[in-house]
């Protein structure tokens, strides 16, 4: 990535930039949105007259460390942004005393059924309970929660309601007080400011 003037250039894993400003969420929106079969940001926006900057998406990953130590990760990012897995890998590696070997997105049904209970894939919110991790799982029994800078200042936003077919309006939700690590885990993109 580089600026038009040529005064700044960086690869996507190192680029630091400021995303566009979010569009404020309207005041008269219901607390719960019924969102059947609306599992993507585009589906939710198109069906509910929303903008992606008003949504926080939650992506789950599994961090696999040496000695088969596995940590589930909740990565939260604004709906118009994308997680940069290299930045996320580097941030997680700094958090733990073990050597991070692999970071993979959790999407396959077998992994979910083996390790998670009552897990609403496609409808996950930032307040997902640690009890969704099965006692029989080899995973650490607590989600490591990470939020990108682009989403950490949103005080009112839409995210998964932690139940199938529902999204929720979060108001006055403070990531600073919820055991979240705030960091840069997003891809820089055209139109960002430096």
Predicted ranges, named:
Residues 1-194:
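Extended, low-hydrophobicity, polar/charged segments
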């Amino acid at each position: 990535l580089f600026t038009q003037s040529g005064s700044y250039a960086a690869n996507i894993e190192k680029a630091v930039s400021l995303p566009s400003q979010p569009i404020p969420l309207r005041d008269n929106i219901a607390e719960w949105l019924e969102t059947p079969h609306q599992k993507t940001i585009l589906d939710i926006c198109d069906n509910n007259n929303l903008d992606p900057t008003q949504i926080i998406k939650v992506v789950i990953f599994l961090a696999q460390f040496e000695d088969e130590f596995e940590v589930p990760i909740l990565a939260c990012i604004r709906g118009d942004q994308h997680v940069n897995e290299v930045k996320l890998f580097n941030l997680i590696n700094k958090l733990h005393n073990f050597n991070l070997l692999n970071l993979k997105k959790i999407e396959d049904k077998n992994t979910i059924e083996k390790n998670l209970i009552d897990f609403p894939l496609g409808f996950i919110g930032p307040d997902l309970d640690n009890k969704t991790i099965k006692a029989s799982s080899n995973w650490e029994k607590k989600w490591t929660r990470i939020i990108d800078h682009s989403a950490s200042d949103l005080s009112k936003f839409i995210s998964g309601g932690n139940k199938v077919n529902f999204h929720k309006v979060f108001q006055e939700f403070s990531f600073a007080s919820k055991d979240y690590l705030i960091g840069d885990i997003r891809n820089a993109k055209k139109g960002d400011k430096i």
